[in-house]
């Protein structure tokens, strides 16, 4: 190999330093040796006695020192010694190729060898590390030459053995010397590589003198390998390329030679995996210029050579097409084969470049020896798996340069098979060889390699020669006769069957290849003859008796042959053999053939009929493929997933691996190429389909479907993006256009194409630009429907475009012969799911097409889509029901028709039942889901329904007929259900099925009755819930078992509300004796939903049990029971008449009394404790009992304690327990006795008239103080007056109230209160309190009476109290009822106002301002008083005055008052409240007062306050905006925005009036159509009732719609403006009619 020495001898031997490498052409030292010998004659080599090389580190003086001279002489002698052996080997090899014989070469190097060995023995220990490597290279080269040139003879062989032994020992010593050195990594890369190369090369020498003992001594030490890898990891190779490219090239080749599989596993780390590829890539980059010249070689030369016939002598060597011109004769052909094998895992393009460089640049193939030619097929087999046009071209280029070997048809056939096509001179040679003279083995080899290129007659001759030792001659004659005739003679005996062997398999394989060849030269007659030959030969072979194959590869070949024979219709009955072959084939080294192996074995599965044996093969295939890597999962999905059973032991592991994938896109999974995929199939789609199918068939789908659905959803989301990818579609279009465009540049185009990087397809590269067609996408959609996974909505546009493209493709563009094109079934289903508009109506033809064409597992989805696409939205319920029933009937008919046609081949029994069950569930639920449809069906199902239907439906017989037809079809569909699905359908839709068709429901129940004994008790309860008519059967089955021990009462409670009452009575009666208080409460709660149908005996038994276990109940449990019993009481109050109503109420009240314990409530404190723990929701249950208890035990002790009574009433009122009984007791006991007695006592003390009590209103002066505070008495009286107050109808001695009128009772109570407090201040407090109440009218009457009395005695009222009195009169609006003229009111009014403070004056002013007449009466007096106190008024008083002014007519006095208030506000503008400023602006706007300075200051202050805590109510905001509109002053945008934003946030709480006002202001303020205005607009447009009924609101909304007509959508404006448009049109019509009448009259 071109590695030992540099050609530059001056650098190699005469430099001052030891050379970097003995690398270059292996025969370079021979040239060097020639310089030191005479030209011609023999040569004599003298190896002088040399001293050992010095190892001293002392610097030498001068270049001619003795040490350097000795070193030069020693290495010069070694080089000449090596060159002599190389020259001798060259002559021996040249003489071996020469035809002359008897040439004997004497070896003149014996003495030199002895001297060199002696020198090596004495000098090895003194050599340095680099010197040891260098000398080891020379010695290994000498040993290699001697091993290859060893001659025969007993004496000579013994001498050679001794010499080889001595050289081997020296090499081992030198390697050990270098291995022990610590300077290996510092040695030059070329020196290290040369030593490693020559040592590795000795491993492949085939010589008996060099046995295993010698080979074990001569090995590359690990230290040298690690040093080499260290250099290659760095920049050593790059520097070497910069110094000497030729040497660097040889270093690369040397490394590729020694980088065997053994060395890679032993020395390469994980980071060195790509080191070989990197070195190869660098070598290819350097040699590209040389191989490029070979690529652009004119094709004409090769074509001419391929078409030249072989010469007549058959042995002349052909002229090479191209010569190297470099002089290289290394590496050898064997070394080329080793290099190519070591790079078999690298890039195909780099491997082809290396092959071209080794065989066409480094070697001259025309000068190759026969041994080299015999190795050419081995070299070419390393790239046989590269099936590209470039690879074929390179192989043809190589083979075309070889000369035709003589008398070696086997080698010619091997060369021919690598050419890729028939070479005429090779074929002519093979057809001219006499086949009978060949051995059977050689004949079989020729058939194997060139059988497809030979003529049929020549092939027959080769077959006879190959089979003559296997079959008897009679069988061969018979076989030949049979192949030439069409029939076998009747007298022909049955030939003896022979076991299969390699020759028979070869013959059959070649014949099958000739038959299967497409576009070949064979005629149909020859193909028929070949098939007949195959059939007869197959009959002669006993496949079961075949000898087992020696290795997995022949087993795979035999298995493939059996598969092909079986596919051709031939009988191959050898299942055991097939199993053995499959198992043995799966032991083949995976490499690049794993996919092919799996594919071949999977294709052979039909030959095995036993399911167990098939399962064994499939499990072996999965183990062979692997389950833990991405590539293994991809292989599994492509080939094995359709074959795997759900019970496979590898299923769980594969599912686990699949769940880790977020996509099945091979590119994203970094699967650059996928083998075993036919062209035109989208790999991504195939992976997705098989992956989903595998998950659906796995056991995990039944245990955790949601997890698998999430994974499939993720896959589908990525897949839809892949399908919709516009870049991929563009590439497909561009590629198609480029493929169609013809080449027009001729030879120039060809050159350019050669310069482009090659695109190789090794083992079937993934078609990156392909996408799914409609059929593949249909399969994907089918898988999604089976998995229940939704298609992303974003895919709807792609789906629509595909359907339209399909319709356009099937319909011509000119519009002629238009036909209805239906979308594929799954496409149609997803169109309905995604609301994709499909221009296809639901017709019988369309339904038949989809049900016949769809996958049977999604028929229920297709039928579902029919209902969705039909769009049965009818207003008439009869039409809607008729349409749905017709659609269901037609679907069922087509379904049943397909069941009958394909049940034996397409439908398995379990699958049929599942699909029918899914279909029934959907159709029944869809037809009966609407309540109005259920009402019509009930009418049809009533007794005499046909007659009733005829009367009510007015002759619409079609609905009745369709109902009958659908019932028959449903019955036929139910017949296909299995037992498990009958149970499932019965428990899910039996109730609705009975409603749709009672006869069908009875039939289904009849089928269910046969398996009721297998139902669990819970399932029986669900059944009777769905079908109440089965209650007798269910009760009978339940009665046979012990319900207490066998039925879980909790499960029963979940369904008891919908069970028939007899079933409930049966189950509850069985469990009731052992139930606790909580269970009884739950039973009562569940039964309360159907209280009207609960039997009395069942309710009584449950209540009885509840009373028995009451003692063990907690307070919470009792409260819950109270809640439940309260429901029964409420229901009984609302329910109608019933015979047992009184008994039910009695039982419930008894239970309530049993639950309620009132004995411990004997004081106010205990009552508080009881009510705190008792929920308010139960007040209705205990109200009556508790009230009686409180009256009897608590109220009597509190009649003298006002605070206690007030606390009691407040407590009862808070808990909604202040009943009429308690009120009557307190009024009668406290007000009518205690309080009245105190009044009478005071009257006696004052010495009133003995004729009786005088009215207290006649008392003049102060009275005695009472013992009770007036505020507490008023609070108690008000609590008692809140709500109904009914006194007993008959009077008695202890009560002074007669009658039961509520008004009289309240009035009497407050009369007592009024009589008890006679001072003006107390009376005023009473009046003021009563005015603020919203109680009965009696309170107002008492308040008016008190005001009238105080007005009459107003002289005794203080000024401030007088203002409060005026406020009460104003709030009561009773000015007209007072007799002001007959009293001294005017005098007291003026005096009180004069003496009152500022606040009291404002209160008085507000009181008189509500009555215009009263105000005019005192206007001249009040206004000056207010003006005097403006400066001392508070903010609240100022706002009160301004609010009061708004309701008065405008006068000059009011204007002066407003002006004074404005002047005051200007001085304190920063301290003013926003409400006061708004009131001031509102007053200016109401009365039209123009005060720009004041207004601008107010607006500026309000704008300032917008940014910090801007809080106003809606009325204030509207007032501010309205003031701005009325006064026409400028509102800053910030203030306007804040106001409308406030309105936007509070729009939900605005009244209709406020909303209309805000809408009108949105137009008047001219704020624009902002977001806030948009919110107000939408809110206003939603008020349809107000728009119709409120004229002002409608006018405001219409104004808004006119103003913002461009912004508000028309569909929102139309309802508002429609009335106005209709009115305008009506007026216009009337005007036209009037004009027409006038013109007619005229």
Curated annotation (Swiss-Prot):
Biological role: As part of the mitochondrial 3' processome (MPsome), involved in the maturation of guided RNA (gRNA) precursors.
Protein known as: Mitochondrial 3' processome subunit 2
Self-association state and partner proteins as the record states: Component of the mitochondrial 3' processome (MPsome) complex composed at least of terminal uridylyltransferase KRET1/TUT1, 3'-5' exonuclease DSS1, MPSS1, MPSS2 and MPSS3. Within the complex, interacts with DSS1.
Chief site of localization: mitochondrion
Record bears the keyword Transport: no
GO BP term, pick one: mitochondrial mRNA modification
Region (Disordered): 43-69, 745-772
Any one of the GO CC terms: mitochondrion
Keywords attached to this entry: Mitochondrion, Transit peptide
Transit peptide feature, positions: 1-27
Polar residues composition bias: residue spans: 49-65
Keyword Mitochondrion included in the entry's annotation: yes
Location of this chain's protein in the cell: Mitochondrion
Disruption phenotype: RNAi-mediated knockdown at the procyclic stage causes moderate growth defect and reduces production of guided RNAs (gRNA) due to a block in the processing of gRNA precursors.
